[in-house]
Amino acid sequence: MSATDRPVRLTLAALGGQGGGVVADWLIETARREGYIAQSTSVPGVAQRTGATIYYLEFYPRSGVDAHGREPVFALMPQPGDVDVVVASELVEAGRMILRGLVTPERTTLI
């Protein structure tokens, strides 16, 4: 991995019971099948009671691993201004992601 390469960073913002964890698992499995190194973590709210939950995913192409086979070390939590894609299940979740600084006009696509 060169100094200029970086993983693709995606955040899913959902409420408990909306299937955010299932979607995160699908995306990770799909990325791995397509040759990416992938990781997901979650920042659970009160998910069982429709509370806000953030799923954070990072993907890096296996072909980008350096000649020594060192894989990238991924982050455990999204950082403001460093997320490429935010998928929000509801408008209020999109607003929360904007307020947390995870959506920026320079980098982020908000879905």
Segments and roles (model prediction):
Residues 1-111:
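Active-site cofactor/cluster-binding pocket
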